[in-house]
Regions:
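Donor/substrate-binding cores of folate-linked one-carbon enzymes
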Residues: 1-101
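Internal anion-binding site segments
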Residues: 96-168
């Protein structure tokens, strides 16, 4: 009678796909949320029903955002079911022009490219925490990176400030 309903961990139509939580952090989004939607044959393209939004903390990680969104999803699903039962649910088609895709995460994504700017690296470390995680190679050994901070140029010593980006 109603079809299948899904709780998706993004504010659709942004971040359709398997990695919406992590990509929101990696891309520096200021907010995220959950969306209830009708399922269809195409991934995350069904009509939307309800959304709930959360502001991302400046040090938000993939894990911390996952935990926040998981706490929001259940109550939103219950509200959606109530609206479906009483006939007040409204189907909202997704705008294709606003859609983005959040691809599946791969372990290789965590290999830090030290030529990226510092802000991008910091968001990557936060977004991929704790899985798949980030890492680098130092003297042939793999080193996991769990946290990092971007420092202001003014706080560096003269030799640190003169170092090539990516110097560890």
């Amino acid at each position: 009678k109603y079809g299948c309903i899904n709780v998706h961990a993004s504010l659709l139509p942004k971040y359709r796909g398997a990695g919406p939580i992590q990509w929101a952090v990696i891309n520096g989004e200021k907010e995220s949320g959950v969306t209830t939607m009708y399922m269809c044959r195409e991934i995350d393209k069904g009509d939307m029903l309800l959304k709930d939004t959360v502001t991302l903390d400046p040090k938000e990680t993939g894990d911390s955002l996952h935990d926040k969104l998981s706490m929001m999803g259940g109550p939103l699903l219950l509200k959606t079911i109530d609206q479906l039962e009483d006939g007040s649910a409204v189907r909202i088609p997704q705008c294709e022009e606003e859609s983005t895709y959040a691809p599946k995460l791969e372990k290789t994504m965590g290999n830090i490219d030290w030529t990226m700017d510092a802000d991008r690296i910091e968001r990557l470390v936060r977004g991929l925490n704790s899985w798949p995680g980030t890492f680098t190679k130092i003297h042939g050994k793999t080193v996991k990176i769990w946290d990092c901070d971007v420092v202001c140029q003014e706080t560096l010593t003269e030799s640190q400030a003169a170092a090539t980006p990516g110097t560890v």
